[in-house]
Design a protein with these regions (language model features):
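Bacterial N-terminal signal peptides that target proteins for export
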Residues: 1-7
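C-terminal motif of bacterial Sec signal peptides marking the signal peptidase cleavage site
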Residues: 16-18
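Conserved functional acidic sites
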Residues: 22-233
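Short, linear, compositionally biased motifs with a strong N-terminal bias
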Residues: 12-13
Length: 233
C-alpha cells in the first residue's frame, strides 16, 4: 500500500509539474527593454498613430457606468526633464457629469531613430467634489522605475510591451491585436486603425481597449469616442 501511494504521489507531482510548465508556456511575455541608449530624444515628433506637437488636442466623449464622461488630451507648450531626458508634457483632463475627476500631466519623448514615443511618467491629481483627494497612479522613470513604450514607430500585430515600468505603482502594458480596423465617430470615419488591449499585472482581471487612427491618434478609449481633434487655438 505504501509503495502504491508513493507511485500515486509521484504521478501527481509529475502532473502538477507538467501543468505548471504548460501554464508558463501559455503566459504572455511583454517587452520591458527598449534599447533607449540608441535613441536621440526630441520633445516633439509624430508617427503614424501618435502626434507629439504643442497645441494638438483630442476630445473624446461617451458614457462610462451610465455617466457622461469627457476626456480632453492636450499637448502642452511645456517640457519637463525626467532623469537626463527632456520630455514633452501632455495633459489629460477627465470629467464626469461636468465635474473634474482627474487631471494628469504625462511625460513623453520621441525617439528620432525609430519614430517611437516613449513614456517617462506622470503626475496625477484625482478629484472629488472639486477638491484633490490623492495622487494615485503618479510615477516617474527615475531610480528603479524605467520608461515604457507608448506607441511604436513600426507597430506589428502581436507585439506586447510595457507602457509603464514602476513596480507596485504603475505597470500598464499593451498588446497590438489588430491593424486594419474601421471606425466611425461624430468626428469622422477612419480605416486602417490600430487596436490595442491594455492590461496590468497589478489588476490581472482588468482589460481596456483603445483604437488609434492614422494621422489622428487616439479615437476610442473604452466607451469614449473622438468628437473633436486638431490644434487648439
Amino acid at each position: 500500500m505504501l509503495i502504491q501511494n508513493v507511485f500515486v504521489l509521484a504521478g501527481l507531482s509529475v502532473s502538477f509539474y507538467c501543468c505548471a510548465q504548460e501554464k508558463n508556456k501559455s503566459a504572455k511575455i511583454f517587452t520591458d527593454t527598449f534599447n533607449l541608449d540608441s535613441c536621440s530624444f526630441s520633445t516633439t515628433g509624430r508617427n503614424q498613430f501618435f502626434i507629439l506637437e504643442p497645441g494638438y488636442q483630442l476630445t473624446l466623449e461617451g458614457k462610462e457606468d451610465n455617466e457622461a464622461t469627457k476626456l480632453v488630451i492636450t499637448v502642452l507648450d511645456e517640457t519637463k526633464k525626467v532623469g537626463n531626458i527632456e520630455t514633452r508634457v501632455v495633459e489629460e483632463n477627465e470629467s464626469v457629469n461636468g465635474q473634474t475627476v482627474e487631471i494628469s500631466r504625462n511625460y513623453f519623448a520621441f525617439c528620432q531613430q525609430t519614430n517611437s514615443i516613449f513614456y517617462f511618467g506622470e503626475e496625477v491629481d484625482n478629484y472629488k467634489n472639486g477638491k484633490i483627494i490623492n495622487h494615485e497612479g503618479a510615477w516617474l522613470a527615475e531610480g528603479k522605475n524605467k520608461p515604457g513604450l507608448m506607441m511604436a514607430g513600426q507597430p506589428e500585430v502581436g507585439y506586447r510591451y510595457y507602457q509603464e515600468i514602476a513596480p507596485g505603482i504603475a505597470m500598464d502594458r499593451a498588446e497590438i491585436i489588430s491593424i486594419g480596423e474601421e471606425i466611425k465617430t461624430s468626428a469622422g470615419s477612419w480605416e486602417n486603425c490600430l487596436a490595442i488591449e491594455e492590461t496590468t499585472p497589478l489588476s490581472p482581471k482588468e482589460k481596456e481597449y483603445k483604437m488609434y487612427a492614422p494621422g489622428i491618434g487616439l479615437i476610442k478609449d473604452g466607451n469614449l469616442l473622438l468628437v473633436k481633434y486638431g490644434f487648439a487655438k
